[in-house]
Swiss-Prot record:
Extent of Basic and acidic residues compositional bias: 588-603, 612-624
Name assigned to this protein: Transcription factor E2F8
UniProt feature, compositional bias: Polar residues: 543-552, 794-805
InterPro entries according to UniProt: E2F (IPR015633), E2F_WHTH_DNA-bd_dom (IPR003316), WH-like_DNA-bd_sf (IPR036388), WH_DNA-bd_sf (IPR036390)
UniProt entry tagged with the keyword ATP-binding: no
Gene source species: Bos taurus
GO terms of molecular function: DNA-binding transcription factor activity; DNA-binding transcription factor activity, RNA polymerase II-specific; DNA-binding transcription repressor activity; RNA polymerase II cis-regulatory region sequence-specific DNA binding
Assembly behavior: Homodimer and heterodimer: mainly forms homodimers and, to a lesser extent, heterodimers with E2F8. Dimerization is important for DNA-binding. Interacts with HIF1A.
Length: 866
């Protein structure tokens, strides 16, 4: 079996008898295979020549293939052709040849070019509508319906409608809907176009181009390439800048540049083409001249011949529509180089007076104004401003430029200073302007420089008091008393007012809390260096009968030698040891002793600060009847603080109603900054600050070395309910002190809230504790008697002590030198100065009316701060 299979497989005679099967002809070779005759079963058909598919026969072969693949109509048409193909080879070839040779006949069956021309189509379009339609009738035009009825593409209808819209014969309603106006507005728009063309000197441009064409005998291509720069150069020499290419009127139809789509629209070009007919003296315009003028207006420097011919073709379309409107007709102009096609104006004659009325429709006075305004709008939209170069810009770049300009406008219009609040400065509720806070450091520095240039003077500054108080007599100082100088009234809601011009560098900030409607103030005081003053014997703080509370704070600087202060007690009833507080009954006696002369002089509000450590006294020739307590302020500045944080420590205590002059509720405030004066919300006799006006403040200032200044509020500042007091922020204090040169840049001031304070009666004064220099001086803190504290509590007067930011040294026996800093951060070791003690140096100090605290030297160093 295997041998038989092998024999069958290798039998050559059987192979010779077998016939090779024919390949199935593909669809592309079906015609050739059918045409070829059958020469016998053994012959192999000739293979048709294969054509490489990489390179198409024509440039549009691939495009046709893609279109046939996408368009179902073309694909179906090809399929139908394939179905109707006759498989008979010779007959199919004859049919194909007949179809090829009958191409002209097929074109003859289609509409001719003349029938498809825009002019004929425009005639058909205009025949559908009357020349002067009735405005009461609906005259809307749907372009889709018109294109379907006329059996043309819609774009052909758009070409007609754009030219008609340029003459205001139609107006656009929607994307493909227009309203037919006919020739009602034709004369009016022609008058406007003529006047605008005369203003832009179109006639002179036409004459200039004709003159150059006569002079230059070149062909159209050469003349076009050479005449443009020649004309531009000669127009400047002839003194006609309006005809220069850069300044020739262009198009400005709400577009970014003249090369945009709207500027090249058929509507704008039609208006300019009609304008050329209206302004030319022989109203004959060739398309070449019109194309040159319109090309120059486009400000295109690199136009080639193809663009110029494109412009001429567009003008031909416009001319066909205008010819259908019987406005122009085609003529030929004979020139040296031959005949040239041109068009002659056959439309209505337009009078040179543009204000002539339209003969068709009656016009009123309002119509004349509307006509003039329409003329201006047309001139503005049709022609650009002179002397404004235009550049090509893509719409995406327009949006980018607009966004950049808007950002630049926002940056330039942004306020460079803090916002100002516009309120009446005269009212009590006016808010200070924040913009001056930014200039605070510069103003203070300038004032300090001015003051440093002047010689040091001891000036007594007296500010005008309230209406019911008299002026306070000046105090003589050991260094030749100077005449009084009235400081400027602190009427402005914000500002820097020097309390005393003195070129001293250190400063003590004093916080003045205001009412909730206002802001806090900080007084930066500059203590003097050398001289101190003590009031003469017999002087005691005078109390104004009309006030509801008083505050007397007197602080003395202690001596390093620890002198015995018993010898100083008979000299002055106000010189006290540190830490002694006046009991209630004895202080009332002191008030009664001075009440009679105080009533004679009128109610006076003052505060006394003295320095008993230096043992300097007032001059003996001071008048005795002037028993007026004065506040001795060094030079300083009143600085309002608009942004403050509320103090964490505030205490309130209702006093007994046994005294009719006392207000029911008062609160005492302690400052977290060492060296800052705490202020009571009750009225203090030392200083009177009405709301947003510091004029009633009386400051009798002498160059004393002080550590704290009593500050008070007026009745306007007192409220029936307690409110938190604001504390200046650290940034404001550090910024101001550093720019004033008061502290070094490395030193930072902390203004965080300090420990709470003990409740105090409104009749008890606010007590300020000032740090003392522990390195050079040892202070003696006199201790209060417990019996005095109990006596004050039984009388309804509780003892008050402010939260000091540093420990107060005790008596020299047990005192330990503690490193203290000028500005201490809150939370350090504290000791209430008003704590009841048992050690007193003498019995005379128990009858004193003020609390004296040892003073330290105002020396600030970075080591102390850290």
């Amino acid at each position: 079996m295997e041998n038989e299979k092998e024999n069958l497989f290798f039998e050559p005679h059987k192979r010779g008898l077998m016939k090779t099967p024919l390949k199935e002809s593909t669809a592309a070779n079906i015609v050739l295979a059918d045409i070829q005759p059958d020469f016998g079963p053994l012959t192999t058909p000739t293979k048709p020549k294969e054509i490489s598919q990489g390179e198409p026969w024509t440039p549009t072969a691939n495009l046709k293939m893609l279109i046939s693949a996408v368009s179902p109509e073309i694909r179906n048409r090809d399929q139908k052709r394939g179905l109707f193909d006759n498989r008979n080879g010779l007959s199919d070839v004859k049919d194909c040849l007949h179809e090829h040779f009958s191409g002209d006949e097929y074109e003859k069956s289609q509409p001719s070019r003349k029938e498809k021309s825009l002019g004929l189509l425009c005639h058909k379009f205009l025949a559908r509508y009357p020349n002067y339609p009735n405005p009461a009738v609906n005259n809307d035009i749907c372009l889709d319906e018109v294109a379907e009825e006329l059996n043309v593409e819609r774009r052909r209808i758009y070409d007609i409608v754009n030219v008609l819209e340029s003459l205001h014969m139609v107006s656009r309603l929607a994307k493909n809907r227009y309203t037919w106006h006919g020739r009602h507005n034709l004369n009016q728009i022609l008058e406007t176009l003529k006047s605008v063309g005369e203003e832009n000197k179109y006639a002179e441009q036409i004459m200039m181009i004709k003159k150059k064409e006569y002079e230059q005998e070149f062909e159209v291509s050469k003349s076009y390439n050479t005449e443009d720069p020649i004309i531009k150069s000669n127009t400047g020499q002839n003194g006609h800048p309006d005809m220069c290419c850069a300044e020739r009127p262009g198009v400005e139809l709400r577009a970014a540049s003249v090369n945009s789509r709207k500027d090249k629209s058929l509507k704008v070009m039609s208006q300019k083409f009609v304008t050329l007919f209206l302004v030319s003296t022989p109203q004959i315009v060739s398309l070449e001249i019109a194309a040159k003028i319109l090309t120059w207006e486009d400000h295109v420097e690199d136009l080639d011949r193809s663009k110029f011919k494109t412009k001429i073709r567009r003008l031909y379309d416009i001319a066909n529509v205008l010819s259908s409107l019987d406005l122009i007709k085609k003529v030929h102009v004979t020139e040296e180089r031959g005949r040239k096609p041109a068009f002659k104006w056959t439309g209505p004659e337009i009078s040179p007076n543009p204000s002539g009325l339209s003969p068709v429709l009656p016009c009123a006075a309002s119509d004349l104004e509307a006509r003039q305004s329409s003329k201006e709008n047309c001139a503005k939209n049709l022609f650009s401003t002179r002397g404004k170069p235009n550049f090509t810009r893509h719409p995406s770049l327009i949006k980018l430029v607009k966004s950049i300009e808007s950002d630049r406008r926002k940056i330039n219009s942004a306020p460079s200073s803090p916002i100002k609040t516009h309120k009446a400065e005269s009212t009590q509720n006016s808010v200070p302007f924040r913009s001056k806070m930014a200039q605070l450091a510069a103003i203070c520095k300038m004032q300090l420089e001015e003051q440093s240039s002047e010689p040091r003077k001891n000036v007594t500054v007296q500010l005008a008091g309230s209406g019911h108080c008299k002026s306070v007599a000046p105090l003589d100082t050991p260094a030749n008393a100077e005449p009084e100088m009235m400081a400027p009234s602190l009427i402005q809601p914000l500002g820097v007012v020097p309390l005393l011009p003195s070129p001293l560098s250190p400063a003590v900030p004093v916080i003045l809390p205001q009412t909730p409607s206002g802001t806090s103030y900080a007084i930066y005081l500059q203590p003097a260096q050398a001289q101190t003053i003590t009031p003469p014997p017999g002087l005691s703080p005078t109390v104004c009968p009309t006030t509801s509370s008083n505050a007397m704070i007197s602080e003395d600087s202690t001596d390093a030698t620890g002198e015995n202060a018993d010898s100083d007690a008979p000299k002055s009833s106000v010189s006290t040891r540190p830490g002694s507080l006046l009991p209630g009954p004895e202080r009332q006696g002191a008030k009664n002793r001075e009440r009679e002369p105080a009533r004679e002089k009128g109610s006076k509000r003052a505060s006394m600060l003295e320095d008993s450590g230096s043992k300097k006294k007032f001059k003996e020739d001071q008048k005795a009847p002037e028993n007026v307590s004065t506040t001795l302020f060094p030079s300083g500045y009143l600085i309002p603080l608009t942004q403050c944080s509320t103090l964490g420590a505030e205490s309130i205590l209702s006093s007994n109603e046994n005294s009719g002059t006392l207000s029911p509720n008062h609160s005492i405030y302690s400052s977290p900054i060492a060296g800052v004066i705490p202020v009571t919300s009750s009225e203090l006799t030392a200083v009177n600050f009405p709301s947003f006006q510091v004029t009633p403040l009386k400051l009798m200032v002498s160059p004393t070395s002080m550590a704290a200044v009593p500050v008070g509020n007026s009745p306007a500042l007192s409220s029936s309910h307690p409110l938190p007091i604001q504390n200046p922020s650290s940034a404001i204090v550090n910024f101001t002190l550093q720019h004033l040169g008061l502290i070094s840049p490395g030193v930072q001031v902390s203004t965080s809230p300090g420990p709470g304070t003990i409740a105090v009666s409104p009749r008890i004064e606010a007590v300020s504790v000032t740090p003392e220099n522990a390195g050079a001086e040892q202070g003696r803190a006199t201790k209060c008697d417990a019996s005095i504290l109990s006596q004050n509590q039984t009388n309804g007067q509780s003892f008050a002590g402010t939260g000091a930011q540093q420990p107060v040294p005790v008596t020299p026996k047990g005192s330990q030198p503690v490193a203290e800093s000028f500005f201490r951060t809150p939370g350090g070791p504290t000791k209430p100065t008003g704590s009841p003690c048992t050690d007193f140096d003498g019995a005379n100090y128990t009858s004193v009316g003020t609390l004296l605290v040892p003073q330290r030297k105002l020396e600030v160093s970075v080591e102390d701060v850290h």
